[in-house]
Amino acid sequence: MTEPAAHFASHAAAARTLRIWDISPPLDERSEVFPGDTAYSQELHFSLSPGCPVNVNRITLSPHTGAHADAPLHYASGEAAIGAVDLQPYLGPCRVIHCLDCGPLVEPAHIAHALENLPPRVLLRTSRTASQSWASFTAIAPATLALLATKNIVLIGIDTPSVDPAASQNLPSHQQLLRHGLRVLENLVLDDVPEGDYELIALPLKLMRADASPVRAILRELS
């Protein structure tokens, strides 16, 4: 191959569009929240008219609606709000691990097959079709988070509403997150994502006093 042709081929390869997976559920009035939490609502605050050149919505929602990032403040008073946390955990190489039909908790044995050369972020796919329902879902065993912490991960994500069961009062898995300084994403949609390694982009909003933030989470193929 001549030098100009080689340069063109290299440039074409670099310019190839990498595939993106949108792993966020839609946000609207059908979005489920923890029983008693603030439901999503939306209305027009300003409306296009002869005296108004724009539409502007007013939106009310819990910061735990849809795909979201919990801040340490969510499970420990005096800890950091979501607008104060480091953004680095929410951006970079990650691994999607399939632990389908594993029951009420993701145990260490369910992820043991995928721990070699682990990148710093792990997303767990527990169901064939993600659901935001609080009625029944898979959470993460504290022992699983403790194991992942030994692998030097910085973030864990899951395709269910919470890393703890809905009825939990002491939130042992959230406490493991706090103990090991791990960040967390909940309510992801991993239905169409093969097991493997990706780039994660899921930045929270800079909400300076909030205990969580919605994210628009995506995965991008590495090459």
Curated annotation (Swiss-Prot):
Zn(2+) 1 binds at residues 64, 68, 70, 186. It catalyses: N-formyl-L-kynurenine + H2O = L-kynurenine + formate + H(+). Its cofactor is Zn(2+). Coiled coil: none annotated. The active site is at residue 74. The keyword Zinc applies. Keywords: Hydrolase, Metal-binding, Tryptophan catabolism, Zinc. NCBIfam families: trp_arylform. This is Kynurenine formamidase.
